[in-house]
Amino acid sequence: MPGGKRGLVAPQNTFLENIVRRSSESSFLLGNAQIVDWPVVYSNDGFCKLSGYHRADVMQKSSTCSFMYGELTDKKTIEKVRQTFDNYESNCFEVLLYKKNRTPVWFYMQIAPIRNEHEKVVLFLCTFKDITLFKQPIEDDSTKGWTKFARLTRALTNSRSVLQQLTPMNKTETVHKHSRLAEVLQLGSDILPQYKQEAPKTPPHIILHYCAFKTTWDWVILILTFYTAIMVPYNVSFKTKQNNIAWLVLDSVVDVIFLVDIVLNFHTTFVGPGGEVISDPKLIRMNYLKTWFVIDLLSCLPYDIINAFENVDEGISSLFSSLKVVRLLRLGRVARKLDHYLEYGAAVLVLLVCVFGLVAHWLACIWYSIGDYEVIDEVTNTIQIDSWLYQLALSIGTPYRYNTSAGIWEGGPSKDSLYVSSLYFTMTSLTTIGFGNIAPTTDVEKMFSVAMMMVGSLLYATIFGNVTTIFQQMYANTNRYHEMLNNVRDFLKLYQVPKGLSERVMDYIVSTWSMSKGIDTEKVLSICPKDMRADICVHLNRKVFNEHPAFRLASDGCLRALAVEFQTIHCAPGDLIYHAGESVDALCFVVSGSLEVIQDEEVVAILGKGDVFGDIFWKETTLAHACANVRALTYCDLHIIKREALLKVLDFYTAFANSFSRNLTLTCNLRKRIIFRKISDVKKEEEERLRQKNEVTLSIPVDHPVRKLFQKFKQQKELRNQGSAQSDPERSQLQVESRPLQNGASITGTSVVTVSQITPIQTSLAYVKTSETLKQNNRDAMELKPNGGAEPKCLKVNSPIRMKNGNGKGWLRLKNNMGAHEEKKEEWNNVTKAESMGLLSEDPKGSDSENSVTKNPLRKTDSCDSGITKSDLRLDKAGEARSPLEHSPSQADAKHPFYPIPEQALQTTLQEVKHELKEDIQLLSCRMTALEKQVAEILKLLSEKSVPQTSSPKPQIPLQVPPQIPCQDIFSVSRPESPESDKDEINF
């Protein structure tokens, strides 16, 4: 296998596999430690059998097993369990829980936190052991109606159990149980595996077969193997003297190295049939003993040890020397490592040349042995002149000589010359050249030459003639595999794919190739007929059909229809099967491996063998969006079926559809989003609440003077904005209430009027600037409403004063009024004295008798005479005439009773300005006094650090009444409430 050199060595999260292996005989749950209530993300089959719940029923329930609590469950134990989870501790409890059928059972519950590579607790492991037999019988409603016999039986059973508990156990038995429990349910932080991605680990005394040391060692063994393959035939054929200490030591060192290699093979990992790396020492030893151990042992026996002794029989020495040929079995090491070396092009070329030369060397040794055996006839002690050795000796001038004293033949070519000549002959024969200077003459030599030519022709044709074709036929998948890898590498290099993603791509290709062995399943199935293809698909998906009860009632035809639609995919660690937000268009069955479901960066479920995830297509009409990511933790094999294909089969097989929808339970439904709260978020909220609780609040009471002061400023600002934005701000109405004088006297033409200002912004009579001031003169409008009559008198005072710059106070208003009087003065100068005369007196009786004030219709007509204005003023109701101050700008055609002279108008305006300035000064002084008192109170309260109390109302501050002028009314002007008093009136 091309990918078999290293095996599947990508980092993977084998936490679930390790826990299942260690707790194979127990029941356990896995809960997420980062989500509120620690929901269950995995439960093994043992817990499902013990509790009676299906895995889908247990998922997302609390790891504290609160769903199994009942009326007999101890409340204190429940609280201790929750505290253990809150504190991320390890602990064990004896707790009474209820099965799904509400049967009470005593459990020995052990809790242990699982940490990741950052030492953060991410999971909780909860193991359960049924200890009901060791506890007292549970008293519930079902046991209250027992008969006397049943109670007697229970009493006997209790007595026996008590005796067994009180009887001292055997020491060995106790140690055995303790060690067994420690092996299966050890909950120490050093023993429990971590939940993280990690490369496959090996024990300390196990060597990885792909590590640098082992790779170097394999190349050394390869070189020594070739050395053995060369020297063993040479020593056997040419009978080299074993007394050569150097060669003897070298051979002994080689033998020791091969013995060390045997020891290392007992501690070296190997690749299993599924592509996984086997690091279990027991499996490694059994595998080596069954395969290459015997061959390696025979090739490492010290056959030269006999040569270390002197006076050894020549026959025995030759026998042991011949046994050295067994060392050629070391070539098996080359065969088993051949797939390692064939991955390199230069190594392939070197190996081919070495093989050709090695065969030529072996044939040369055999060729010399034949010549040496035939050149001297041991029976007659004569030399054969037709042997190739004799002919060679004659040709090179080193003939054989007979030693009469010793009775043996001596001389002849040297061993080096003989070996070179033998190798020369075999090479020319193998390459079909054959120069003819060395040729076979005897029958044996000719027979060997024929055999050598046959082998040589085949070897030559194989290695040099058709090497490319043979490799393509023998390693077609290998060539395709390397071609695919090269294409992928070029693609990744061309588009500069990141290193991490490149490694994932390469690992996925290697792992997929190791699983499929380079065989295109779809291509093979397309060759088969429909019936055979369906049978093959049923066989390929047999694990899904046999493990899930939803397929048990399916007919053969239904299974065949489903099997054809199933697809098998292989996922590498870290691969995402579903991204959050993408469409869920397939139903996935986990056959091997483990996956995790991640929602909002939290693990909400861990899926293993036999789990199903996806969507319930047969109950939903729309295509679902994945609410979480599904990521592979290890190498996974998934069998998936598309939504359309599944619905098509269910629509056709209606009977199976009902059974399928009823019996198939999804372990994880990606359509439904799991609602949870993170413990970290809850802690943050609690910290924020505590922080706000501990903060010192700097709030001021509602009745505090400072709050009242700022509230007053705010109200004044709002009212000022409202006053400037009124739709008809031309008329600033004043409510005037007439009331009798305090002394009770009635003065003709004089009344007491209370003027309450509607707009609380102004503390004195002011003029409001309107939009019409750009076209005509500004005038003040006031309504006088006496309280005495049934029908209140409404008097409008029309002022001829023009406001150019809007509302003003103090000297600013005086300045504006002065400019207005100067303009008015010019106007009055153009009016004659006769036209400005009118009746100024009014009969008091007439005013008292009438309930309403009638307006005097004054009409002014301009004559055509130069500068003379005629007046048809009638003086029948002169007492009711209005002053020029009461002139309304809106009544342009009204009749005017009289027109005062310019000096009187100027005097009136000055008096008004004077009064207003005094009022403003008095009001400002009062407010400054009030503000000073309030500031003093604030400073006093702040210094004492006590709760401020509501200030008492401030008494009214009377203002000095200015000197009266003739026909002057007394007004009482009210202003807005201040923080010091509810009513603050100013009389003048």
From Swiss-Prot:
Q: Which CDD domains match?
A: CAP_ED, PAS
Predominant location category = membrane
A single Gene Ontology MF term assigned here is: calmodulin binding
Give the catalysed reaction(s), semicolon-separated.
K(+)(in) = K(+)(out)
Q: Where is this motif: Selectivity filter?
A: 432-437
- Where are the annotated glycans? 403
Give the record's intramembrane annotations as residue ranges: 420-440
Instruction: List residues, modification Phosphoserine.
Output: 883
Name the keywords, alphabetized.
Calmodulin-binding, Glycoprotein, Ion channel, Ion transport, Isopeptide bond, Membrane, Phosphoprotein, Potassium, Potassium channel, Potassium transport, Transmembrane, Transmembrane helix, Transport, Ubl conjugation, Voltage-gated channel
Keyword Membrane, does the record have it? yes
What biological process terms from GO does the record include? potassium ion transmembrane transport; potassium ion transport; regulation of G2/M transition of mitotic cell cycle; regulation of membrane potential
Annotated region described as Disordered, given as residue ranges: 718-742, 839-897, 946-965
Disulfide bridge partners, by residue number? none
The annotated regions of Polar residues compositional bias extend over: 721-742
Provide the membrane topology annotation: Multi-pass membrane protein
Q: Which SMART domains match?
A: cNMP, PAC
What is any one of the record's Gene Ontology cellular component terms?
Answer: plasma membrane
Offer one Pfam family short name for this entry. PAS_9
The segment annotated CAD (involved in subunit assembly) runs over 909-948
What influences the activity of this protein, per its activity regulation comment? Inhibited by low nanomolar concentrations of cytosolic calcium.
The record's note on quaternary structure and interaction partners says: Homotetramer. The potassium channel is probably composed of a homo- or heterotetrameric complex of pore-forming alpha subunits that can associate with modulating beta subunits. Heteromultimer with KCNH1/EAG.
User: What family name appears in the similarity comment?
Assistant: Belongs to the potassium channel family. H (Eag) (TC 1.A.1.20) subfamily. Kv10.2/KCNH5 sub-subfamily.
Q: What role does it play?
A: Pore-forming (alpha) subunit of a voltage-gated delayed rectifier potassium channel that mediates outward-rectifying potassium currents which, on depolarization, reaches a steady-state level and do not inactivate. The kinetic is characterized by a slow activation time course and a small voltage dependence of the activation time constants, therefore, starts to open at more negative voltages. The activation kinetics depend on the prepulse potential and external divalent cation concentration. The time course of activation is biphasic with a fast and a slowly activating current component.
**Matches recorded under PANTHER family:** POTASSIUM VOLTAGE-GATED CHANNEL SUBFAMILY H MEMBER 5 (PTHR10217:SF533), VOLTAGE AND LIGAND GATED POTASSIUM CHANNEL (PTHR10217)
The entry's protein name is Voltage-gated delayed rectifier potassium channel KCNH5
What gene makes this protein?
Answer: Kcnh5
